[in-house]
Amino acid sequence: MLKDADSFRGAVDGLLDKIGKRKVDVVVGMESRGFIFGAPIAYKRGVGFVPVRKLGKLPADVVSVEYDLEYGSATLEMHKDAMKAGARVLIVDDLLATGGTVAGTIELVKQLKGEIVACAFLIELTALKGRDKLGGYDVVTLISY
């Protein structure tokens, strides 16, 4: 899908349609495919983009959270100055599976006192019940199966 311009545009525009008119100050995308979909969404919405990276990949002071994976745990980080308190945040990633990565990202946003508007995903694997880990936040997806 990424190598085909029409498919990629369709995915980004489809997510934008699902996100609708929600007021957003910043888009947060998780390493690495969250960057691919989050950055163009931020651009189209006229807001900033904040990357969430794995441990040790960001150059400045960070907030961090350890989160559970199917096979262990890992650490996510975000710059401490990534957003102002009260910023309206849209979290974007390609896939919602078990929900561990996005739950960790939600915790990072909370540490910086951001307000999560929604979590947007290209694909949701409903059988893995990742949505259950998201604390009732609004979730939008293009494809669910």
What are the functions of these language-model segments?
Residues 1-145:
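PRPP-associated nucleotide enzymes
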